[in-house]
A protein has these predicted regions:
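N-terminal helix-turn-helix DNA-binding core of bacterial DNA-binding proteins
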Residues: 16-57, 81-92
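Base-recognition residues in the alpha-helical recognition helix of bacterial helix-turn-helix
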Residues: 35, 63-64
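Beta-hairpin "wing" of winged helix-turn-helix
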Residues: 69-80, 86-88
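Amphipathic alpha-helical dimerization/coiled-coil segments
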Residues: 1-18, 38-39, 88-130
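Short amphipathic alpha-helical/adjacent loop interface patches that line ligand
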Residues: 54, 65, 101-104
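Alpha-helical residues within the helix-turn-helix
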Residues: 52, 63, 69-70
Length: 130
């Protein structure tokens, strides 16, 4: 039982480390901005281009980009006075999310195996009543 509790604590810790990313990814408008960035040129696009493609106001796009940037999902580089935004290639947040989903998958598999075993035991014990 102790091992199970430790795994749940580790999962909670990993979930906390990904909270900003989940909040950022949980908004449909930000999802649309990410899709727009992924569909754009490799070098990134400017706020005005995102505004044109998403039909959002400049302040709205800037607000959502700030949240995505703070979450480590979007990066920006400056060329003169122009800012270009792109989906971040920094591995940290993507590795954290990948590790979290892997751990969730392991726990779900473990629970499924236990439920299958429990069902099998119930089937076996019900044979006595037939």
């Amino acid at each position: 039982m102790e091992k199970c509790h430790e795994r749940r604590l580790k999962l909670a810790e990993e979930l906390k480390s990904c909270q900003k990313a989940f909040i950022a990814l949980g908004d449909e408008t930000r999802q649309q901005i990410i899709i727009t960035l992924l569909e754009s040129e490799v070098h990134g696009i400017r706020v005005g281009e995102i505004t044109d493609k998403t039909h959002l106001s400049r302040p709205a796009v800037s607000h959502h980009l700030r949240i995505l940037k703070e979450a480590g999902i979007v990066s920006m580089y400056r060329e003169g006075t122009r800012n270009y935004y792109y989906v971040s290639a920094e591995e940290t947040i993507w590795k954290q999310l990948g590790n979290l989903f892997s751990r969730i998958n392991e726990i779900v598999d473990e629970i499924s195996e236990k439920e299958c075993s429990k069902s099998q035991i119930e089937i076996e014990s019900n044979k006595d009543f037939i």
